[in-house]
Every structure is written in structure tokens, then in C-alpha cells.
Amino acid sequence: MVMQEEKKRQQPVTRRVRSFSESFKNLFRPPRSRDSSPINVTRIPYRSSSTSPKRSSEPPRRSTVSAQILDPKNSPIRQRSYTLKCCTPGLSHPFRQTGSGASNSPTRHRSISGEEQEIVNSLPEYKRSASHTFHGIRRPRSRSSSVSSCDSSNGTTSSSDSQWAMDSLLDDSDNDLTPYRGSNKDILKSKDRAPYNYIDDYNKKALRRATSYPNPLPSKQFYNERLYTRRSHPDEESLESLPRFAGADVQCIIEQNGFKVYEDGSHEHNIKLSGVIAKLEKGNSLPAHRQGSLSRPRLGITLSGLFKHHKNECDIENALSLLPNVEKSQTNHEKRTGQSPNDSNRSSPTQGREDYLKIVNPDASLGSDELKLINSLSSRIHKSLQNYLQEKNLKPAECIGEQAPTFQDNYGHPVGLVGAGAYGEVKLCARLRNEKDSPPFETYHDSKYIYYAVKELKPKPDSDLEKFCTKITSEFIIGHSLSHYHKNGKKPAPNILNVFDILEDSSSFIEVMEFCPAGDLYGMLVGKSKLKGRLHPLEADCFMKQLLHGVKFMHDHGIAHCDLKPENILFYPHGLLKICDFGTSSVFQTAWERRVHAQKGIIGSEPYVAPEEFVDGEYYDPRLIDCWSCGVVYITMILGHYLWKVASREKDMSYDEFYKEMQRKNQFRVFEELKHVNSELATNRKIALYRIFQWEPRKRISVGKLLDMQWMKSTNCCLIYDST
């Protein structure tokens, strides 16, 4: 008996591989840091497929996979066999191809043909080994799978086409996929199709992986629209040169009003399209319109009262751009290449002058080029307004002596109403796509049309001419410089609304912007409140992280928004957030300044205004009021209503209660009662909220430091940003 027990102790203990459910004790734990962390990416919003087989709790330790490889030149199908070797959990899995050198392999062997030997001889030395071992890097599993041709008798999967190696393995420790990153780089130069999805079948005691490809690669426009993932690789291989990987299904564990959370912690947004664009996409053609008019679209819906024609309405048929031709051509070139065409040869416009100012802040959005554009636009707007006030029906200055493209040539015609502002309405315009249009598209589009948001700016009879001119110029310059920022090779932020052009007509000015088809955050919250619902905390966290990154981009380039509120936050259906309306933005630092300019006075909408703005004569940092506004926006998303109407103890009892509780208990009841999916996220969020809602500006956290807090670091966002 003693001898038997001694033998049992000496025998190695066989550890069972952890099952999928055991690997995720905490579904929403913070992601592990990895050397190959993705930058500037958008997670692929794959949908869960109900057709994929379910896996049992224990995967097999060894499996054989057979793949049919079809030579495009010769019709016979050759059969290859592969061996999957299971490794220690946490390490990358080797994937061995059996051949003449793999004598110990349990799978059957096949001699290499003469044609294949020529291919092997043409490869570099490091690729000629008879038994190839492929190692990979981790990559998240996708949420869709397609069924390949499977042989259930021997646990193999067959697929067709040539030179495709096995692309991934399943890591037993955490069910991450380890994709192959080897010779695919050379293969993909001559291939334009992606492999089949890979299917697991743990119930059959075999791990089946096969490759084939009728699925085309996603077009470049999806990558540029940030619908697909961009990841950094050691060999500088972009995702556009790699096949889209589709692995095992991931189960959806939370679904609330179109928002889905999956068991790997990722999520998917499904925001409804606005009513105007939903109507247009159902029809086969654009609605009829009066030629050149911005005011009488026919949508087939009850909007006739909004589009009654008036004598003073804006006809934009002859509206022309106010941007100088040189500036516009350089802007178009910068959109494509990221640099100015004459950067190497062009000298500074002020070179040689004794009073030339040295640029000390090259990252500032407002530099010498923007200053020249401001002067040019101001003079043209002043001249046009003088002609308008004197009732001189003159053509725009740009149309004299040159054949410039009109508004209708570049942006089409109006098809609907989006909203209204202080100085005019915002309309939706659409233009047919043509051969010159190629990805990336910087605004919403479908298979036939490209859509633009057009804001009509017209002075009121009693408005101050100088103030109106300043507002138009500053709003366009700030939005244009932020959305087309290409200095020092840097790309614009994905969370800033693109501003394309400003045009003038005989009686008004027209600003052309990017169109976001899912509407604004205010409309989203109103719609949910009618259904007695609210945003899920994980969805609100994702929106908050995007908002903070957009605001940080503005602050890094010397601009504070100063009017952050749900009405100025727009969305795409897949959850991409855009910050808009820079009419009240403040330039606190230019390219020639080192210090930050403080400001005073109330700016913005009262529920989102920081308390220091209500102090008469007090100067404050505009960056800190943006941080306060972001906090109010987040609480509004979570609660579905304001915390208070005004952040002033004298004017609002709710704010006074918040102030007293913080003074007496050093905590606020509303923040303490907020729930999240787990206690860790709830605690981290609560700590961040207390840092945001500090009524003393010197104690308030900045946007950059807020992004470095554990709450935001552990938040899964639709976009993964560059840490630099």
C-alpha cells in the first residue's frame, strides 16, 4: 500500500486545460498590456453567428487537420496534412506542416513534387526548412464564422486554393487567437481574396482549422472609415495587406437597445439612423427639388411647413468658395498625402523681416497659414456684407474672371432638414458618386451618394456686422484647422467633425461639413427617456473615452471648445463620436506663444458651465471648464437628466446640496449610488468623478490626466488610440 502511494506521488500530475468559462472569472477585467498593442484602430463590429458549433469545456491535446490545396494552373487537387501540437498555456503554439523531414509526425507523409521543390528553392534560406514552425502574435477573436467543408470521421477540414498556410491557433489559457504572421506577406502580393473562417468542434475531440477563400477583402474605404481594425506589427505590415480573420463565435451576454456586449469584453453599437437619412436610403432615388434651392426638398413626409419658400431664401446655385485657390489646392493635396506640395521649396512668407515671430509651439492649430486665411476670409466677408446691406445684388468676388466650380458641382443639392441654429438652418445635401470619388471618404456615404451637412449663415437685421463676421471666420478657421491638421506628419483626430468649405452667395454664407447620420447625443437621450431607458454604463464609458480624446486633441493644439453639451456631440451608427460647433471655441495658445491665455466671463450652456465662470471678473483656464463639461455630459448619459441646472449655490438648490455634502461628508450621494457591471469599475469611475467635479479649478483634474486614470484605461472603446 505504501509503495503504491509512493508511485502515485512520483507520477507527474496532468493538469486539465482551463475551460473558456473558467478563464473569465471577471468578464470586464482590464485588458493586459501587450508589446504589440494596437494603435489608431477601430474594433471590427462582427455580429455573433448562430450557425457555429459550440465547444465543450475541454479541448483536445492533439488534432490532425487536412487541407486541400488547389493549384490555379493545374486542376488536380493535392492533399496536405498538418499537425496541431498543443503547448503550455500562455505560450505561442507552433503549427507544424508535415513533410519529408517530419519523421516523428503521426500523420501520413507526402512527397514533394518537382513544381513544389522549385517553389521551395526560390524561397530564402530561413524559409526552406522541411518542417515549418509558425509562431504568431495574439489577436482578439472575431464574432462571426462561416462553415467550411468538414470531415467528421477523422476530425479534418478541407479547403481549396494554393499556398495558404494555417493562419491561427487557439490559445488554451485564455482562448485568444494566435494568428500566423509568416510568409503571408509575400503570398498576399498576388492574392486579393481572404481565407475562410475557422471552425472549432470540441465535441468531436478535434480542433479543426482550414483555409480557403471566396470571401473578398474589405475595401479600403472601410479601413479609412475606421470600421476595421488597424494594428501595428513588428514587420510594419498593415491590416490592409492581411486577410480579415474570422474565428470562433463569441457569445453576446448583454443586449440593451441595440448595444451588445460580448463575453470577451468587446461591444458593438447599433445606433438608429436619423429619420431623414433612413427615408432616403429606402428610396431608389433622391427626392425632387427646385433647381439650386436650399429650401424646398420633397421627402414624401410631412415637412412641407418647414420648407415653405420665401423671397429671402438662399439660392445656392451660384454660390462659390471663399477659400483661395492656392489654399484649396494645398488642402486637397494634404488630405491625400499628409503634407504640403511645396514644403521643401516654399519659403516663409515673413522670411527676411526683422519682426518675424519665431514659432515656439509647432503643434498649435493656429499658425501662419491659418493667420493668412483669417485675413483673406475677413476681408471677403466684410465686402460681401457691405454689398448685402447696401442691397447690391452682386456676384461673389471669386466668380469674376474665372470659372470656379459651384456649390452644386461639389456638394449636390439639398434633400432634407437636419436642424436649426442661431444664424440659420442646417440642411442635408447629397451628390451622386462619380469616377473621381475614391476612398477615403471624409463624410457619410452609401453605394450611390455622398452626403454633406450644410449650414446657412445669414446676419439678422439687428445683428452687429463686426460680431457676425468674427463668428463666421473663427468658427470656420478653428473647425477647418482641426479637421485637416497635417502639420509634422500628424493626422487629424477621428473624433473631430470635418469642416470642408465656406461659400458665399448674394445674401448669405454657407459652411459645408461632414454629415453624421445617427444624429446627436441629445436626440439619443430624449429617445431613450421616452422609453424610460438610459444608456448602458459600458456604452456611456465608450462615448466618454472618445469625447475625452477629442477634447484632448483640441487642447494639445491650443484650442478649448467651451461649449461641450449633448447637442454638439454627433454619432455614426457604429458608435463613432464627433465633436462639432466651434463657434464659441477659444484659442488659448498660438504657434508663437508658450504660455496659456486665461479668459473670463460665462461661455456655453448653463447646465454644463463650470462654477468659476459665474465669478465676476475671475480669470480661468479654458481647458478645465471643458473637463467639467465632459463630466456633466457623462452624468447626463448615465442618469438621463441634469445633476443641476446651474453650478451656482445662489441659483440652484441641487448644486448647493452637492456642495454641502462634499464639505460635510467628502462624498456625494448620487456618485455613491451609481451602479456599474462590477465593483472595480464602479470604484474607479467614482474616484474619477470626484476628481472632475472639483469647484476649485486648481484641484480639478485635466483631460489628459483623466485619460490616464484606471477608469479610462480599463474602458473598452471602439477606437484604440495611439499612446504617443
Swiss-Prot record:
Keyword Phosphoprotein, does the record have it? Answer: yes
Q: Which domain of life is it from?
A: Eukaryota
**Which EC class is this protein assigned?**
transferase
Active site at 563 (proton acceptor)
Per UniProt, which keywords does this protein have?
A: ATP-binding, Cytoplasm, Kinase, Nucleotide-binding, Phosphoprotein, Serine/threonine-protein kinase, Transferase
Q: Which reaction does it catalyse?
A: L-seryl-[protein] + ATP = O-phospho-L-seryl-[protein] + ADP + H(+); L-threonyl-[protein] + ATP = O-phospho-L-threonyl-[protein] + ADP + H(+)
Q: Which cysteines are joined by disulfide bonds?
A: none
Q: Which residues carry this modification: Phosphoserine?
A: 19, 232, 238, 241
Region annotated Disordered sits at 1-81, 93-188, 329-355
Another remark in the UniProt entry says:
Present with 981 molecules/cell in log phase SD medium.
Official protein name in the record: Probable serine/threonine-protein kinase KKQ8
Q: Identify the coding gene.
A: KKQ8
